[in-house]
């Protein structure tokens, strides 16, 4: 049951979380059949400065194969997130959850924390933190899921 809960909550939380464009958070139908990497981040998070270039690279390299990266910002002040994004542009979907609905539901205790979700909507892994040495392992996990079908 919990395996599909993350995607469902991402959709249900759309009333309190907005995409960077101001549109509702997500369209569940658009995620069907995709491998989804959900990353919780904040402007004050030092490792997030390292993860954003990696996520840009992964989205660019594997997006056409079915990877969707969604970065969920938890800053209380939208301006803090905007300042971070000016310094570290995102070429993937960014949503804002200043009320912390999603991190609370998933027990996120630190930033960044990521979840890797397979094409069937099941959470396959959870990863706390981000170090440059994590890149290869995370990329391999994503590639395995992309080629599982």
For the regions a language model picked out, list residue spans one by one.
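Thiol-/selenol-based redox modules, centered on thioredoxin-like
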Residues: 118-149
């Amino acid at each position: 049951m919990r395996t599909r809960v993350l995607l469902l909550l991402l959709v249900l939380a759309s009333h309190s979380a907005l995409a960077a464009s101001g549109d509702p958070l997500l369209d569940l139908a658009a995620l069907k059949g995709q491998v989804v990497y959900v990353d919780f981040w904040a402007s004050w998070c030092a490792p997030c400065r390292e993860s954003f270039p990696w996520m840009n690279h992964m989205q660019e390299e594997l997006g056409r194969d079915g990877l969707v990266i969604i970065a969920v910002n938890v800053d209380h002040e939208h301006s803090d997130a905007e300042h971070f994004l000016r310094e570290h542009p995102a070429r993937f979907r960014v949503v804002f959850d200043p009320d912390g609905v999603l991190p609370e539901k998933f027990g996120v205790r630190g930033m960044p924390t990521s979840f890797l979700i397979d094409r069937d909507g099941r959470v396959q892994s959870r990863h706390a933190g981000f170090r440059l040495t994590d890149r290869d392992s995370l990329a391999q996990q994503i590639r395995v899921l992309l080629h599982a079908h």
